[in-house]
Amino acid sequence: GPFDPRMGVIDIGKICKTCGQKNTECPGHFGHIELAMPIINYQFINILKKILKCVCFRCSKLLVNKNTQIVQNILNKNNKSRFNDICNLCSKIKRCGQDTEDGCGAQQPKKYFKNPGISDLYAEWDKLDFTTDDDLLDTTSKKQLLPTVYLYQLLERITDEDCEVMGFDSHFSRPEWLIHTVLPVPPPSMRPSVKQDNQRMDDDLSH
């Protein structure tokens, strides 16, 4: 629970089950809650749309040829400029393999968009000739909701090399990390509670 002794202790005389220290020495230890389904972080939804424009909807490969001179010139820029320039190049490509030799041939969505007020992402195609091996998608509709499970798996398949080309640091900012799969739980020492009549209650200012 939220007051698991492994997350640290705040009561005098008790010992933390993680570090073995008393309340005066224990710094507290973060826990986490695993979500039943991935959830898109609304703050990063526009960045997610840009990432999806850069990689194949089916095989997750980068849509541009990394060996061309124009891409090599882009790699000399800072990460933010690199990401924007690569996105602009990829948005012109309609089919995976159009600019590379190892593409799967899948038609790419015409656009990605979201409905106002919610964090669900949708994709829309020009015509119904795209294919996918995933049962989560309906290939009989030009416009469809993209399940967050599918999005997470698609982003997870992006190689570290392609992440670097897009301007991401694969050690600290993988694309799939923009989708929540767990929620952090701060230790009790960071969310102090108030005792009243032998009961512990959350502090109104910090809970």
Regions found by a protein language model. Name each.
Residues G1-H207:
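Conserved core architecture of multi-subunit DNA-directed RNA polymerases
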